[in-house]
A protein has these predicted regions:
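Solvent-exposed, amphipathic alpha-helical segments
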Residues: 16, 20, 55-57, 76
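Beta-hairpin "wing" of winged helix-turn-helix
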Residues: 51-66, 72
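Short glycine/serine/threonine-biased micro-segments
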Residues: 39, 52, 75
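Short, hydrophobic-biased segments on the C-terminal half of alpha helices
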Residues: 47-48
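Amphipathic alpha-helical dimerization/coiled-coil segments
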Residues: 1-2, 20, 75-92
Length: 92
């Protein structure tokens, strides 16, 4: 596993985010706030890092004249999470 990706996933907020995104197709910022129990500012920073690493996808659009942002996990994100999870299981 890439050491940079491993380092990214050891952060509790990023790990909760990736774990949750593995279970849903897309979600909103509000959903991620609830799941991670984080502040808006901190979550925004962590999402930016995950996006820059190519682990998540951020889509912004307007819905009924209101700005909306959806988050989803990428193929790279799924693969990285699975490798990270399996690596943790191997430390028995």
């Amino acid at each position: 596993m890439n050491k940079e990706i491993e380092k990214l996933l050891f952060n509790p907020i990023r790990l909760k985010t990736i774990s949750f995104l593995m279970t849903v197709e897309t979600c909103t910022f509000k959903s991620l706030l609830d799941v991670t129990d984080s502040t808006k500012g901190n979550l925004s920073i962590q999402l930016k890092k995950l996006n820059e690493a190519g682990l998540i996808k951020i889509e912004k659009y307007f819905q009924k004249s209101y700005p909306t942002t959806d988050y989803s996990i990428t193929k790279k994100g799924k693969k990285s999470f699975e490798e990270f999870y399996n690596q943790l299981l191997s430390y028995k």
